[in-house]
């Protein structure tokens, strides 16, 4: 068995190896190639089909195989690939060949004149060669002119993967050969079969009919003769088909390039030709690696140099080396401004070009170009920069030209990483070309390869040097601190580059080389080295990073930031330049991997006296250096003229064309290029102007330079898209349409294109739909017959019907739109119909009606009719129904079309009613009432919608007919009433008759009885009477329906005598006999019955054994009786129960409820006892310890602690029961560190210095250890146990000191957090529940007292505090491993099961393994409630969605309107809930930074209290909620709505998102905007601070521009929502910001403005623009209900804007529901808040791509940004310097006695060494020490603290009298382990090597952030 499985496994592995081998894969791909050859098979088949002999077949096959072999070789062999792939080569091949082919097949017509034998013979001899050539050339065409790209791509992919490439190519060729042979054999068989079959058929036909003989004989030769023609036609068709996919190289559409600088045009063209012709080898490589096989574009590098107008144009530093002295250089910069087009500098530069002055002069060089002829030819035949592939043109209006995306994202090249050669797949291509150029220049010197070991050692050595430099600088700073210099002076400053020395204006952040390094946008060249040194104050060790040295670093980043250069030429001193050559060339040698051994770097002239000796060498080296960077191949000429330094940077290949579509052309957006034709085929659309602003501008905000623009008319236009299928899809003219995937369209209107690959994913496709329900309905109808219909009250049916009507409508509209001259005809007909209707038809009808009324003696209704006629308004609308006005026709209406909408259409009635409607019937009638507007059709009919079917008009005569019907009905009623009376009378008469008849019958019966009696006495006497009886009986039988027998009631029946007997005696005797017999029978039966009854009676009374006494009952009777009684009881009871069931249930439920309520306290009794005990302990302790402090609100405190203890213990219980075990490594640092920050705070200062450094733990006094133990800092069992972890606890303590004043809010701000209880609870959230702790309540007490002590001036510190928290919070999230790295028990954290989010601010509770250490209550800091002030991480992580339960708890705890505690900057007191203007600019900024969820929320502005948006019932009061967990019932705060959250975990209560959107409620609506502006200002923009904040504002401005969010779906193209109001510190209101937003480019929404320079708009336009923007977001989805609503609003609103008195129409449209008041803005004062409230700005939960700033990522991942000096100056007056007596730490000042409301100084209590260095230097040191770890021991990783003396210098005040017997050596060896220098940090590596990670956005860092810090093992 084992052997079998072993064999089986081996066999499987063998099979897998065979399948995956190169040969098999090559065979497979080759076999596939057989089927992808396409039209090249045509010639091969032709040779066989036409039967031209075996020679031709063989030559065709040979040529075909040779061509295919060349193709395969070209895949592997680059020069052949290049030769075949060049467009010019193919063109040269194609043209003569096609000419020859044409000439060859038509030689009869050309050679008619001299049809000599010589020509014919020669041509015949050429036959075979021609066939060979055909078959050889066509496979070569196949990949380049007639591409089938999929297979080529597959082959390329596998070629890249496999190692043995040649083997793969060979095997694929063999596979192709096999497939080809099989294919040819199959073709032969088919041909043979066809021939045989054909002749067989024709013979059969000959026999059947003689008629067919003649044509059949001629058919076969005819076919054979025309075969050549058939093949030519087929070939032509396939070529046309394939050429449709790829435009012909000849018929290229030369596009107009963007306006080049006229002066530069010629020289640039020359260089273009040069490079293109001479750099073949480089192109070969690049074409292989960088572009696909069929890509005809030349190399990237030749493109880069080509267009001077590109954005990424690099600096040219042109040095005139001949005229001037050798050490003076001129620098020239090009500048292309894409942002500041309107600035005068740009305009001058743009227009004047390079003619500005002598400084900007181009040092031109003349050069004879051998290839002068090629440029026009090349551009004529093939323009390689045109869109010859199916590229979408991605517009980006910030950039001039679109980026070409033919360049692969990946570029493979070897580079050094960690000192070793590695292949990098995102290597910058420009760097590789740079290295190739250097290698070319290196041939001047000798070069030698270094071994990998040497390379690595060199790398290690350089890293050591760098690390030593940086650490030395760091140590110097620490020593300076030690000597007592001020902290701010020691901190490394971030050097800023100033523009102006006097005004101290710094460059913006983006352009500052010091702040951004390689990311800088501007390089400011300084005139000389002395000025340079003045400007650039850097540290001594910092000299590596001189300003211009950063040039080489421009190589490194791969992000596509566009560079801007200032045009300024300055001179450098050669000395300063030469000193830095070493640093400049170091990276070159590093990238090169080879060192230039003959270059003597030390020989560079560093001193002035050495200059002459080395001047020649210097010139040579400089020439080498600068010429190495030159791009010109003919370097000799350039060297003689000038030396050129080119800035090297990552280049992006761009198209040289800026394309526009027809819409942009219509808009005239590009005024300077308005004559240019559009090149993009966009969706068929028309521009419809809906609003023209003709009013005089009464705007005070417009600038003076805009007055000249006032004469232009401003328009607002909608784009009306045709609802036809869009087959253009923004294809560029001349691009390959057919190669576009996903181009299949099968719906009439399709918003998204669907690929046929995913047909199965689409619900119902056009041809694959098989609807079973439809089939069943169809069958049903057929089965049941035509008359019976299935009743379908199905909403789907209704929907289908509506959809069908809609489609018909669209079809009609498109038909009108597509027919030539249809629109003018239709428009004129509509206008005619409108005039006819209004002024001719309706007045005539009114006159006719009223005259008829007069004739019919009725009152005429002239007044009412004419009033209705006046009310009818004919509004001219655009083609898609946007109303304009009565008189204003839409622009170009004859061309674009028109609609005429009739408002209140006159419907002529025969009379007017003046009755008042009753109230109960009114609404019902209104429901059925139709809209009182319609559209006019061409035939004068009315229709509900444009192009809809005409609606049924109410008939004029219908009411008349109704009245007639009523009259007739009345007459009928009267007639029927008479009939009813008659009927009733007849009925009564009949009943009387019946009564009479009954009486008669009774009388007769009575007479009969008398007769019988008489007959008994004497029958003979009565014989005569009998006859009388009989006769009367016959009469009665006639009258009555049933015969009545006479003696029927008697016992003895007597039948009447029918036969008349003559012998009366016989009759008599027979009668008497019968009577006697009957009597006898009767008596006998009676007797029998009597006997039976008597027997029964005897039986009952004569049975003594059964029933002894008649009074007693037997057992059986008893049982039956009891059963009976039981059932009766049950019956009664059940009836009673049914009657009382409701009360019974109620009683049971109440009983259960009471039991629960009674039992819950019993369950939790012990808990409560514990808590009360703890509370008592706390208060006793607090009273003893803090007697001198003020008393606090005792009740509140009790309540708080009571709740907290319940919560704590409950969570202990739940944690113990359900522990989720997890290692700390799975937690984020944010979580752990946040928890640390919430731990119990040390209240005494005297511990701070004790814990400052590691060694002092030896000498701690016992009293201090006891204090530690009670404080819970160390949880050792005995106080003499070794104090191990103080190095880590150092950080704990620092954190505690840092976070203690997290809640130090000013009194005013604290008052805003309205409920007092809530304040207390927030304080209480910081408490911990340690079992050993006796001092638990003191912290809150301190805090509350402190709040009461604080002064109001602390408001000034808010901005400072905000910055501080932001700075420190970012970095303080970094360590949990270090804090717990020694204590194994602390490594595991047990979380409660309610932890849901693992995000930024973690609010769930956790306990560590040892509860003695610290158990922190979960909560959220006040930061979350104070909006922007303390929100730190939210700005950095827009991708995550958090849900904060704590916020909900506060909502639910007490019914307080959320506004009262979420108002951000409102000046409010607790008692007065007045709300004034909120800080709009901050919410704008917040929305700008983090794309918040926006909610479609309509809030009607009213003074009533608004309830928060109820997301799934989440904000309900807690009392209405079902109690799901009875254990937590007493603390409603705990009732987490967990189940709801599980259903939708991304939901966020909406009020929390729109934090400060609820201002202005009690403020009167019509206040002036200027008054609101003052309220809208942030605190920091006061006038006295304005100057100091300019710097920060500028930074912020730049940062925000890089991380812009947007509204709706246009993720890239919309601008900021106006955060500039805050940044620039201006006093503008929100409206100018909106204006700014609206004026930014609406590239996605196609709303264009004719006047773009206008700075401010009227309110109406702002509203209109916002509406339009919203409308356009949904325009593609025509069936959206939201879209319809918005569309209606737009139409009505645009109409209302034009009307002078819109009141009546407004009211009617609101009544009809056309216009929703929630959306329309009718108020005057519009602020951003109101726009959001009304739903005009809709923020949608769309994840948006944000362009990350490099610094922003660093800030996100690492950084405490440094303190600005200016801010320190502003706040210095509040800061007091403390005198700390280091020797007597017991006498330290108590914390609160000298506070003065300043929380900042605590951040400097324990100075973090990390803060000394700048983030950049910090990162550098950290990474270098990381590299150092690879060699040495992990413990020695921080050279700064290796020296014990340095540490000792920081202050030697240890108690050296105790515990000296400890192992001091061990302590010294352990070193100080700050968490600042961890082993490695993925984030740092990612930031350094982003081009290795290939990540340009920060989202992927969140993954690395989780597992960032490894555990350090301590030996």
Swiss-Prot record:
Family to which the UniProt record says this protein belongs: Belongs to the TIC214 family.
Start-end of Acidic residues biased regions: 267-277, 304-315
Regions that span the bilayer: 18-38, 64-84, 90-110, 126-146, 174-194, 230-250
Gene name of the record: TIC214
Region (Disordered): 260-319, 1566-1631
Protein name: Protein TIC 214
Subunit structure: Part of the Tic complex.
Subcellular location: Plastid, Chloroplast inner membrane
Role according to the record: Involved in protein precursor import into chloroplasts. May be part of an intermediate translocation complex acting as a protein-conducting channel at the inner envelope.
Gene Ontology biological process terms from the UniProt entry: protein transport
Sorted UniProt keywords: Chloroplast, Membrane, Plastid, Plastid inner membrane, Protein transport, Transmembrane, Transmembrane helix, Transport
Membrane topology value: Multi-pass membrane protein
Bias type Polar residues, positions: 1602-1631
GO CC terms: chloroplast inner membrane
Bias kind Basic and acidic residues: ranges: 279-288, 1587-1601
